[in-house]
Amino acid sequence: GRGVPVSRLLTTSVPHVHALGDCAEVDGQWLPYVMPLMQQTRALAATLAGKPTPVAYPVMPVVVKTPAWPTVVCPPPADAAGQWEVTSSDDALEARFVSASSAEQAGALLGFVLQGKAVSQRQAWVAQVSA
């Protein structure tokens, strides 16, 4: 692992000790970004206030802000079965990771990469992953 192993309640193996942010690995996922930290903070605040609240993440693409070649990455789940389908042109790249698993609807969008002019489609792709 890359962080302190914690449950969805952000509890460690030591009673009354919690971890969040860059140092926490929630159910095997290490997410050193601002949006996961915000979700973790809300969940932990509720838990510490007496209402046990597991952290739940929305679809959270990572935006790499480079003027020459902007990039948005929404990685598929680590254990997802599927394949990448890539299309590109001189000014854009679209890569989609689609499900091949019978447990999920075959062909469902599980992750993506958008680059160049394709980054303008981020919200539409996030909605497809959320569906």
Q: Could you say what each language-model-derived stretch is?
A:
Residues 6, 60-75:
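Central beta-strand plus flanking loop segment that forms part of the substrate or channel wall
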Residues 3, 59-61, 92-94:
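Short, acidic/polar N-cap/turn motifs at the starts of alpha helices
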Residues 3, 21, 41, 50, ...:
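Glycine-centered flexibility sites
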Residues 26, 50-54, 80, 121:
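Flexible, glycine-rich phosphate/dinucleotide-binding loops
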Residues 1-43:
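FAD-site-proximal beta/loop scaffold in flavoenzymes
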Residues 69-131:
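C-terminal catalytic lobe of FAD-dependent flavoproteins
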Residues 53-66, 84-89:
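Short catalytic/ligand-gating loop segments at beta-alpha or beta-beta junctions
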Residues 34-61:
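Internal hydrophobic alpha-helix adjacent to the cofactor/substrate pocket in enzyme cavities
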